[in-house]
């Protein structure tokens, strides 16, 4: 008999699964900073979704799978009239909040946007709450939503710290699926073993490729992939709730496990245990709807636009621009050639620098075809060169710094070289929180005004900006405030 014949004995669960489940079921969040940051992250994320409702490319994807479907006690989709089953509501909310690339960001060996998990969290919490009320039970409070956000951020972010999925061609939404599955399963009241099963189901799924994020195939799926992942998480948690079995060595199984099939045989590495680190250090996009590796470059470009104007010059006088940057920026958004759609443009650092140099602004509308057709943009793009500075790459990976630096040097047609403008930390960085939060609140006010009349805006603001009041509010009551 061959000694290579595999044993059919069921193994113990992989330690990675155990650690995730122990964290969501046993860890008590005591960090006031994490809860406060989660509240700010919540309102910013919802505001991003409200702004996306102005874009038909997004709204065409929203609503029930089958038109006319009615779901008793369904979950509300903020800013719409939809009440949907939690799976489809998670997709709707997740697609909205990610559509314009304006919600939070986590940068490490893997990149991502942990607030994408809010799709599954909010849909499930609202659906549970409405069904609890119908059964004469208490609804969940918004504090439960904030706690789930903190834990989902932590799971996604801690795995991302040392493990690069992009290096093997996988999209980071796999981590949204895993994190959402874990916290949603806990929210649904699954047992520890059932949550283990649910998380294993998330890992055993075929995972999304990064094809839709890169030339020559960059496209709009990158705007709804996160909704798809968090929606799938709710579905898997509900499947596990039926008692469906899991796959305990889904990561480590020889030949057939995630590591061997999709991760070049390498096990995950971890920098730190799960706690509240990620939420406390999350990057908030405050100023510009731009891929985060370009945020500081856009800020520098805005400064240069002002400096040129003061000198009586303009972008027309620019002969060349050098962007001194970090390796991740080069890998993700350094892009030449034609840009065919908004998803292509908001992942091109040359485009995101050219627009503010020309116009003194960068808004979501600037990625649309009408603006992109201006020939001055591509002409200026062609004069921009990116170069890696190893020191900036080291600072990017340094846990004590976590900078996302870009430095712009402009050479004018007459040979004049302007002083380099270096921006190390974007406005939404932890090191600039005090400066950023008032502007984040203003961003939320602006997004509320896009969708609601003044009285409704004020009611939402009053609830959202008061930490204690928000935490105590039933989830269904809070989401009812966003109905139209």
From Swiss-Prot:
- What phenotype is described for loss of this gene? Cells lacking this gene are still able to use propionate as carbon source.
Signal peptide (residue range)? none
Write down the top EC class of this protein.
Answer: lyase
Protein origin, superkingdom: Bacteria
| Entry annotated with the keyword Coiled coil | no
What's its catalytic activity? Answer: (2S,3S)-2-methylcitrate = 2-methyl-cis-aconitate + H2O; citrate = D-threo-isocitrate
Q: Which Pfam families match?
A: MmgE_PrpD_C, MmgE_PrpD_N
Pathway annotation: Organic acid metabolism; propanoate degradation; Carbohydrate metabolism; tricarboxylic acid cycle; isocitrate from oxaloacetate: step 2/2
One MF term in the entry's GO annotations:
2-methylcitrate dehydratase activity
Q: Could you state one GO biological process linked to this protein?
A: propionate metabolic process, methylcitrate cycle
Q: What is its EC number?
A: 4.2.1.79, 4.2.1.3
Supply the alphabetized keyword list.
Lyase, Tricarboxylic acid cycle
Family from the record? Belongs to the PrpD family.
Question: Subunit composition?
Answer: Monomer.
Q: What job does the chain carry out?
A: Involved in the catabolism of short chain fatty acids (SCFA) via the tricarboxylic acid (TCA)(acetyl degradation route) and via the 2-methylcitrate cycle I (propionate degradation route). Catalyzes the dehydration of 2-methylcitrate (2-MC) to yield the cis isomer of 2-methyl-aconitate. Could also catalyze the dehydration of citrate and the hydration of cis-aconitate.
Q: What is this protein called?
A: 2-methylcitrate dehydratase
């Amino acid at each position: 008999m061959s000694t290579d014949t595999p044993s059919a004995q069921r193994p113990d669960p992989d330690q990675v699964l155990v650690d995730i489940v122990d964290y969501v079921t046993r860890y008590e969040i005591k960090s006031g900073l994490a809860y406060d940051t989660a509240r700010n992250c919540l309102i910013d994320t919802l505001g991003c979704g409200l702004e996306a409702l102005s874009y038909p490319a997004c709204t065409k994807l929203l609503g029930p799978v089958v038109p006319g479907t009615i779901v008793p006690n369904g979950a509300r989709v903020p800013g719409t009239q939809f009440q949907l089953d939690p799976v489809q509501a998670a997709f709707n909310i997740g697609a909205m909040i990610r559509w314009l690339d304006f919600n939070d960001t986590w940068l490490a060996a893997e990149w991502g946007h942990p607030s994408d998990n809010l799709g599954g969290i909010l849909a499930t919490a609202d659906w549970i709450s409405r069904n609890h009320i119908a059964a004469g039970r208490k609804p969940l409070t918004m504090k439960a939503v904030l706690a789930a956000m903190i834990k989902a951020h932590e799971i996604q972010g801690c795995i991302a710290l040392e493990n690069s999925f992009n290096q093997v061609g996988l999209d980071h939404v796999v981590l949204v699926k895993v994190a959402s599955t874990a916290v949603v399963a806990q929210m649904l009241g699954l047992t520890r073993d059932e949550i283990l099963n649910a998380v294993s189901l998330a890992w055993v799924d075929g995972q999304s490729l990064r094809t839709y994020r890169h030339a020559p195939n960059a496209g709009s799926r990158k705007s709804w992939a996160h909704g798809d992942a968090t929606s799938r998480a709710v579905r898997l948690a509900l499947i596990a709730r039926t008692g469906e079995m899991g796959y305990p060595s889904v990561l480590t199984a020889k030949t057939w496990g995630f590591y061997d099939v999709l991760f070049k045989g390498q096990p995950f590495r971890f920098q730190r245990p799960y706690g509240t680190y990620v939420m406390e250090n999350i990057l908030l996009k405050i100023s510009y709807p731009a891929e985060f590796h370009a945020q500081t470059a856009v800020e520098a470009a805005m400064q240069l636009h002002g400096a040129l104007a003061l000198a009586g010059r303009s972008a027309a006088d620019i002969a060349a621009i050098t962007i001194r940057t970090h390796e991740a920026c080069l890998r993700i958004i350094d892009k030449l050639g034609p840009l065919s759609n908004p998803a292509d443009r908001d992942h091109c650092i040359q485009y995101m620098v050219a627009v503010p140099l020309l116009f003194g602004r960068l808004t979501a509308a600037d990625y649309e075809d009408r603006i992109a057709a201006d020939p001055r943009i591509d002409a200026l793009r062609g004069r921009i060169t990116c170069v890696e500075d190893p020191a900036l790459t080291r600072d990017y990976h340094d846990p004590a710094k976590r900078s996302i630096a870009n430095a712009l040097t402009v050479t004018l047609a007459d040979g004049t070289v302007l002083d380099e403008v270096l921006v190390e930390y974007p406005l939404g960085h932890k090191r600039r929180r005090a400066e950023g939060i008032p502007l984040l609140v203003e961003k939320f006010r602006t997004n509320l005004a896009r969708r609601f009349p003044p009285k409704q805006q004020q009611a939402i603001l009053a609830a959202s900006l008061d930490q204690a009041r928000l935490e105590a509010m039933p989830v269904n009551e809070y989401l009812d405030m966003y109905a139209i």
